A protein has these predicted regions:
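Active-site core segments that coordinate phosphate-bearing ligands/cofactors
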Residues: 1-141, 146-239
Length: 239
């Protein structure tokens, strides 16, 4: 989350795993940002496919998830290397809960994508709270942004439009080119460089605020349960 040329109120690493960073520096002016991230998103899908062999590939997860409207109570916490938000807890672990004999493969696929989307929504919440701003849309790039199913779930859980840019898998390369070329080499400003981007698709929220709040509350409860479990082991209860 870019926050301008003033140093954000929280510097270094905050209590919730949010980082205050210098995003870029041009013309001797620093531009700051707040950053949170989910350590295992695409890598979680690869782990599920390559190590557990539950699905052939990540594309199959997305395709199966698109065939159902919900996970029917199944939740996936993608904390394969711990949690950063809402609390920095490296000892937290991934979990797949709420499974019954009636659970289908498609519902597990949906839960996996929903777990990633919930985690990203937590990051958005943390950034907005610290910066004291309200984001109007989420612009996405990278490999996972190729999943329409994931981006629709993300829009529903974050309550804001999700905009996928053209050639989103080249987002990092495009950002480097914008920074390198926006000092007069190719463009006069970063804003001028950004104006050249082309939108591939926009995913609008389809869930109402009540349904969104219920889903988010259920997810927060699952995260808090895992944090309590990790804390108990930290205190020696698991010995």
């Amino acid at each position: 989350l870019l926050v301008g040329t003033q140093i954000p109120p929280v510097t270094g690493t905050s209590h919730d795993g949010t980082l205050t960073m210098t995003a870029r520096r041009q013309h001797n002016v620093s531009h700051y940002s707040l950053e949170t991230f989910v350590a295992t998103t695409g890598s979680a899908l690869n782990w599920i496919c390559e190590k557990l062999h539950w699905f052939d590939n990540p594309a199959q997860i997305s395709a199966l998830a698109a065939t159902v409207n919900s996970a029917r109570g199944v939740t996936f916490l993608p904390a394969l290397t711990g949690l950063r938000v809402p609390q920095l807890q490296p000892n937290a672990r991934a979990s797949l809960c709420g499974i019954s004999i009636a659970t289908t493969q498609a519902e597990i696929a949906y839960a996996i994508l929903e777990g990633i989307a919930h985690s990203v929504a937590l990051c958005i919440d943390a950034n907005q709270a610290i910066a004291d701003v309200e984001a109007s849309e989420l612009v996405v790039g990278g490999g996972l942004s190729g999943s329409d199913t994931l981006l629709q779930i993300q829009a529903d859980l974050s309550g804001m439009p999700v905009r996928r840019m053209h050639e989103s898998d080249r987002a990092s390369l495009r950002g480097i080119a914008f920074l390198a070329g926006s000092s007069g080499l190719l463009w006069d400003s970063l804003q001028q460089a950004r104006a050249t981007t082309v939108t591939d698709a926009v995913f609008e929220p389809s869930a109402d605020s009540g349904a969104r709040a219920k889903r988010r509350a259920s997810w927060h409860a699952r995260v808090e349960a895992e944090l309590a479990h990790a804390s108990a082991f930290d205190n020696g209860c698991g010995d």
